[in-house]
């Protein structure tokens, strides 16, 4: 029997890569050092017994999720229906600015134009619409640079790509200034903070998040039976669906089992080492902290260029997350309210139904801690090219997660896992 493919890490990237590789016919073993799957999306219970998670309650860009489930078995809609859930369109986003003004912004293009025209006038609405249309060009370029194909180095950035990504405004801070409106400028700056970075150090093209939200909508997980609304907005249901998919595909999951090292022989991966001894590995997909991957798991002489690049990077800033009881929302849906300072620092509140009332989850970007699970902080455009590539310098070792060039959002993490699975599958076919 062939040696298994080993996946290190049971977060979103690890679950997604394992599901794809198992469906492709490989024997897969997943190792997770904690006692639960899901990473930062893992569900857990409060003292009150309510099941919560630290994931965003609103999901954007669902296509990667749908592709993942379709390519590993039953489609997403069918899998959720089997569990009693559905992925449904979410309501608009409400923003409260430093001066007390409020803006409820729908996701669709026409709705945004109408709301902004009514609130700020036609010229402001047109500037916003034109900006997001231009970001659509950047989005098309980014698809081939880490999202749907691997990004290796600067040679992939031809003149047309650089023009669509950068234009005249290099940072999100400059882009925010160009909109010439206090409120909308703060909205643009908030994109950087929600990515764990600063607007002055974040490339302007990171604002594509505004375009994808307008183009692909906002979504929430909710029960099929609306009277049973306790899990509305609990995004970790997707983790539970992925865990079920791994069981269906007979992926061996080892919880409470940390991997201490990856063994290389004759220039390629051959095994991993755990507390219980060595385990053979035909290939390894690593989805944990990138500094741990290259400084601890791999031998000291492996991937020297990536090691040097990582020394110039730092983890992203993760928000403080709290959960507290609140008044029940008027409808069985998630209500997202973002309080944004003049500088663009957001505090995100997700209010959703809970037993005997409501539950409010708060992501406070005024209080942050460095966290590799949240991705890599921007430090100018060049930092993007320093992110570890999906295909590492070590044959048979692949890296996927929020640190990948694709980006830290859930859909981007799922896409990086797809690239890792495809490259790993091709590698295994080439060596057999």
Language-model segment annotations:
Residues 3-140:
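N-terminal glycine-rich phosphate/pyrophosphate-binding loop and immediately adjacent elements
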Residues 56-61, 193, 319, 402-413:
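Glycine-rich phosphate/pyrophosphate-binding beta-alpha loops
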Residues 86, 252-256, 398:
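General small-molecule cofactor/ligand-binding pocket signal
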Residues 99-103, 107-204:
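Rossmann-like flavin
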Residues 187-225, 392-395:
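Active-site-adjacent "gating/activation" loops or surface patches in catalytic cores
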Residues 210-269, 273:
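Helical element adjacent to the flavin cofactor pocket in flavoenzyme catalytic cores
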Residues 231, 260-357:
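Mid-domain catalytic core of redox enzymes
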Residues 342-432:
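Conserved flavin/dinucleotide-binding core of flavoenzymes
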């Amino acid at each position: 029997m062939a040696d298994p493919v080993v996946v290190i890490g049971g977060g979103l990237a690890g679950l997604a890569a394992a599901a794809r590789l198992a469906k492709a016919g490989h024997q897969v073993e997943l190792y997770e050092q904690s006692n639960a799957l899901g990473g930062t999306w893992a569900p857990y219970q409060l003292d009150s017994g309510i099941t919560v998670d630290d994931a965003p309650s609103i999901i954007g860009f669902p296509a990667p999720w749908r592709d993942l489930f379709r390519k590993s078995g039953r489609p997403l809609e069918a899998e959720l229906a089997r569990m009693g859930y559905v992925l449904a369109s979410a309501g608009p986003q409400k923003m409260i600015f430093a001066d007390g003004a409020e803006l409820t912004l729908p996701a669709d293009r026409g709705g945004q134009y109408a709301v902004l025209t009514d609130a700020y006038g036609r010229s402001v609405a047109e500037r916003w619409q034109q900006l997001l249309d231009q970001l659509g060009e950047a989005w098309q370029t980014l698809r081939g640079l880490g999202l749907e194909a691997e990004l290796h180095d600067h040679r992939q950035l031809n003149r047309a790509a650089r023009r669509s990504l950068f234009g005249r405004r290099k940072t999100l801070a400059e882009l925010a200034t160009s909109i010439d409106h206090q409120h909308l400028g703060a909205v643009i700056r908030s994109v950087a903070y929600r990515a764990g970075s600063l607007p002055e150090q974040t490339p302007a093209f990171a604002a594509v998040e505004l375009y994808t939200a307008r183009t692909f909508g906002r979504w929430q997980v909710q029960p099929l039976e609306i009277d049973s609304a306790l899990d509305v907005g609990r995004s970790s249901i997707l983790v539970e669906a992925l865990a079920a998919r791994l069981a269906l595909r007979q992926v061996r999951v080892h919880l409470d089992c940390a991997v201490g090292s990856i063994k290389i022989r004759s220039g390629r991966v051959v095994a991993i080492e755990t507390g219980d001894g060595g385990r053979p590995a035909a290939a390894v997909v690593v989805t944990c902290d990138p500094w741990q991957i290259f400084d601890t798991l791999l031998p000291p002489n492996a991937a020297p260029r990536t090691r040097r690049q990582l020394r110039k990077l730092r983890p992203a800033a993760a928000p403080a997350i709290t959960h507290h009881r609140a008044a029940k929302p008027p409808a069985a849906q998630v209500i997202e309210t973002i309080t944004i300072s003049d500088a663009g620092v957001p505090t995100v509140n997700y209010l959703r139904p809970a037993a005997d009332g409501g539950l409010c989850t708060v992501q406070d970007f005024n209080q942050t801690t460095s966290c590799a699970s949240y991705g890599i902080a921007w430090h100018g455009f060049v930092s993007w090219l320093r992110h570890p590539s999906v295909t590492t310098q070590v044959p048979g070792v692949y890296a996927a997660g929020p640190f990948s060039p694709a980006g830290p959002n859930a859909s981007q993490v799922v896409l990086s896992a797809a690239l890792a699975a495809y490259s790993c599958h091709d590698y295994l076919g080439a060596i057999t």
